[in-house]
Amino acid sequence: MTDQQKRSRIHRWLGVVATLAVLGTVAVATGPATTTAQAGPGREDTAPRHRDAVQRSLDELVRADDFPAALASVRERDGRVRHYTAGVADLRTRAKVPTDGYVRIGSNTKTYLAVVVLQLVGEGRIGLDEPVETYLPGLVRGDGVDGRRITVRQLLQHTSGLPNYTALLPETYELIRHRYVQPRELLDMGLSQQATDEPGGTFAYSNTNYVVAGLLVERVTGRPVREEITNRIITPLGLRHTYFPNVGDQEVRRPHPNGYHRDRPEQPLTDVTVMDPSMGWAAGQVVATPSDLNRFFTALLGGELLGPGQLRQMRDTVDAPGPLPGSRYGLGLQSTPMSCGGLAWGHGGNIFGYSTVNAVTDDGRAATIAATRLPTDLAEVEHLLAALDTALCG
């Protein structure tokens, strides 16, 4: 395997394919699973056919794709919420998967950060079409990279041309699993590579964009990104099961399914639940439950976090080529056509140990599917997305 192939594989694992939203069909099978349906106090689940289809899709992820566990939270148009699980939380003890357990949500963090930036835009403290240089003078410079020519909008929309720092992370995960990485180190890794395009060019997903956006937020507000996301989003929405881990916090709060990883498909799985998530920072560090993730995206699309003008900007998309036809990317938000018609809005995220796909619709549906290892090929990604489509379209 060449160095470029190794980098491409890590690049894929850390969020490129996982930012894609929803499309596909799902196979049917059975496997070890548990199901919990919750629709609020005293309300009965009246959609067994849809419920069974979602459960079968999770069972198939465990049986056919060998994900240790899969879990889902689905919100219907009428507000009913149902939770699903399949597999086991711990491969050693065979413990039951906790209903709506905590997972690392990876690149979904980008949407939280984009909301913070857009709130600051609404407050007149950041200009979307201002150059990055205005806020971070002299910081963003490299081979074909110049912060004087890159706007804040281009950062959030992945049209800046900034190269992706994850391409230079070590191939062997254990080398960095417990190491704290400074945000400036992540930026330096990105800037050590050549620009991928001119600013304002084609969409090219790069975690480096959101490292720069995080540094920009800290410079403008004088506070850590963690505090801004907590104070502006998590606390106001009452997201009691969402948090941005503090420096040195390597645990995932309980209850959670364990996360697993292998560097190559032929290797045995290693428990990587305990890890330093700083390699993701403002691009991928948040932890949440599936239902909290649904609540966040539902609130966002419902206008609870941004004014109408900022939300319109967020939903103004460019073509985002990838394995899903019709996918488009806005400002930290992706849209994808659903098999049942209409658009799904979400993001998705991969980080070592966990993969999440999620989306909400304009009519109030929301779904998050989480699996407890990273997909290792495109087929597994498609199966995760198919499970999400089943949850939204039934």
Which residues make up each language-model segment?
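Hydrophobic (often cysteine-bearing) scaffold residues that line and stabilize catalytic clefts
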Residues: 50, 54, 105, 109, ...
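Solvent-exposed coil/turn segments that connect beta secondary-structure elements
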Residues: 77, 89-91, 160-161
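Short active-site loop at a secondary-structure junction
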Residues: 65-68, 92-153, 197-206, 281
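Catalytic loop of the DD-peptidase/beta-lactamase superfamily, centered on the K-T-G motif
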Residues: 2-3, 32-85, 270-394
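Residue-level preference for non-acidic, small/hydrophobic
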Residues: 58, 78-79, 110-113, 117, ...
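Short, surface-exposed loop or secondary-structure junction motifs
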Residues: 83, 143-344
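Alpha-helix N-cap and coil->helix boundary residues
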Residues: 53, 69, 127-131, 147, ...
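Secretory targeting and sorting signals
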Residues: 1-39
